[in-house]
Each structure stands twice: as C-alpha cells, then as structure tokens.
From Swiss-Prot:
This is Ribosomal protein L11 methyltransferase. It comes from Streptococcus equi subsp. zooepidemicus (strain H70). The gene is prmA. Belongs to the methyltransferase superfamily. PrmA family. It catalyses: L-lysyl-[protein] + 3 S-adenosyl-L-methionine = N(6),N(6),N(6)-trimethyl-L-lysyl-[protein] + 3 S-adenosyl-L-homocysteine + 3 H(+). One of its GO terms (cellular component) is cytoplasm. It comes from the Bacteria. Pfam families: PrmA (PF06325).
C-alpha cells in the first residue's frame, strides 16, 4: 500500500496563499486549507449552520508528499521559503510545522473533507470539481480543484472580490485579474458577462493552476492566462482591474492601474487587513482614483475605486 506524508503548517491568514504556493513548489501533491473564517455564520450544503467556532487569525494548511520524498529536505526547503516571506514583511504569525504518514486511501479523501459547495454571492456558487451539483435558476457555478494550491475560493478576501465584481460588471467589459492564483476571479468575471478577461500571475504554478481550473468551467474561452509581474509593461486597457493580493503589493499596482483603467472604469482591491487599509487607500487616491465602495468582512477589507471626474456617489478620502 502506497503511503503519503502529511505535513501541516499553521500560519497567519494573510500568508495563506503565499505559503500554499510554497508547499506546492516543495513538491506537494495537494493542499487543504482549514480556516475558521470559512465557517463563521455559514450554512453547509444542506442548509444547516456549521457548529459555532471561535474565529482565529491563524489558518491550518495541510500538504501531501509521496512517501519516497525526503521530509527533512522538504522541511528545510519550506523553512527557507518562510524566511524569504518574512524578509518581504509577510505576516506569518507563530508558526507550527508538523508531519505524519498517511495511507493512500486516507490521502485520497482526507483533504476533500474540508471542501463543500458554497454559495458566495447572490449569483455565484463555488463547487469542488468532483461534486455533482445541480444549479438553481440563475445560479452561476464556478468549479475549482482545490487539490493544487491557492485554497478553495471561499476565503474572505476572495468572497469580497466576488461581491465587488458582481457589483460593477454589467456585461461586455474587459477585465484584468492581477495575481490570479486559482483563476476564480477570472472565471467569475466571465460568468458575470465580461467580454474578455486577462489573468496574470508572476508564479508559474499559479498560471498552471489557473489554466486547469478555467478548463473545468464552461464558457471561459474568453479568458487569457499568462505570466506577468503585476501590471508592468501592459498596454491593454480595461474596464475593470481586480487585484486580490497582499496589501504591501497592492500599493505598487495603483499607478499602472490608473494608466490602464478606462475612464469611468473600476479598480477592485482586496486582501487588505484593517491595519494596512489606510496605506492602500491612500496609494489609490494618490494615483487619481476616487473611492466608491468599502466592504469589510472580519479583519479583511476590499475597496472599489473609480476613475472618474464625477464626484457624486463617491466616498470622501
């Protein structure tokens, strides 16, 4: 019987995607993310509330490696990667790293237990790729395979981004997705009526994962995925730019975003913890955007900015 090695790491929620990607690059065959924020006040697929849990700033990420892999080398690689993240001022919190062996049949199903279909917005439901799910009238289904990296698409920062896209997209727009990760925001943009979507990520793993997830979904031939360093060097204008990435990186996006967003277009920024909200907001205001909407879930913030000279309906900076 082939066995697997299960490695579990507990980190601050802000570092979830960066650490998930690190585990994949170290050779993981899949990751599962357990975040209490995904369950606070949420109903499961049967309409029942999940048991009451105390929300924590920490998330638990479980990765799976073949039994033949040298777990000591893997731990060393991961620790080196974590050190690099610390140097980039990524909030990691109090780290915990453990590992154990897991039988083949346990590995095949263990991480799937974390993932149920989830109605995220009025129109959008995220469904795991292996689940048979019948959509109701008007319900738009996003199919994802979370067994790779970048979580399940139900993290508060992703939810806020999806709410924002649902708010600004009316059909026929060009959208740029910065730091696409799983590709969930690009898929959602297409389902919500965008004419064309351009998805970029600096990481080759993310580009592959996004392409694989997009292939799981219908009517997504209009999504173009490529490697790219934020918005640097791009000339393609867009009606909407969405960026769900670390706050410290968002501040470097605003100037290029203003250059690329069409007049009366939108910049959506998510992934912002409350303590860094003013920093991100000021960067966008300095670039020339006007703040239209501020959304909050727990400690996470999303901002919708507009490129306009019309001050009506705009929140004061």
């Amino acid at each position: 019987m082939k066995a697997w090695q299960e490695l579990t790491i507990t980190v601050h929620r802000e570092a979830e995607e960066a650490v998930s990607n690190l585990l994949i690059e170290a050779g993981s065959q899949g990751v599962a993310i357990n975040d209490t924020a995904d369950y606070i006040g949420q109903e499961n697929r049967f309409g029942e509330l999940y048991p009451a849990v105390e929300q924590s700033e920490m998330v638990t990420i479980t990765a799976y490696y073949p039994n033949s892999a040298d777990i000591d080398d893997i731990r060393q690689t991961i620790n080196q990667g974590l050190s690099r993240l610390k140097q980039c001022d990524v909030e990691l919190g109090e780290l915990t790293l453990t590992n154990q062996e897991l039988a083949e049949e346990d590995w095949a199903d263990n991480w799937k237990a974390y993932y149920e279909p989830a109605r995220i917005t009025h129109d959008l439901t995220i469904v795991p790729s292996w689940t048979d799910y019948e959509a109701t009238a008007g319900e738009k289904i996003i199919r994802l395979d979370p067994g790779m990296a970048f979580g399940t698409g139900t993290h508060p920062t992703t939810k806020l981004s999806l709410f924002a896209l649902e708010q600004v997209l009316r059909g026929g727009e060009t959208v740029i997705d910065v730091g696409t990760g799983s590709g969930v925001l690009s898929i959602a943009s297409s389902l919500l009526g965008a004419k064309e979507v351009f998805a970029y990520d600096l990481d080759d793993v993310a580009v592959r994962v996004a392409k694989d997830n997009i292939a799981l979904n219908q009517a997504t031939d209009n999504i173009h995925v490529a490697a790219g360093d934020l918005l640097k060097g791009l000339t393609q204008e867009a009606d909407v730019i969405v960026a769900n990435i670390l706050a410290d990186i968002l501040v470097h996006v605003t100037a290029d975003a203003y250059r690329l967003v069409k007049d009366e277009g939108y910049l959506i920024m998510s992934g912002i913890i409350s303590e860094k909200l003013d920093m991100v907001k000021q960067a966008a205001l300095n670039a020339g955007f006007l703040l239209e909407t501020h959304m909050l879930q727990g400690e996470w913030n999303a901002l919708i900015f507009k490129k306009t000279d019309d001050l009506s309906g705009v929140i004061g900076g």
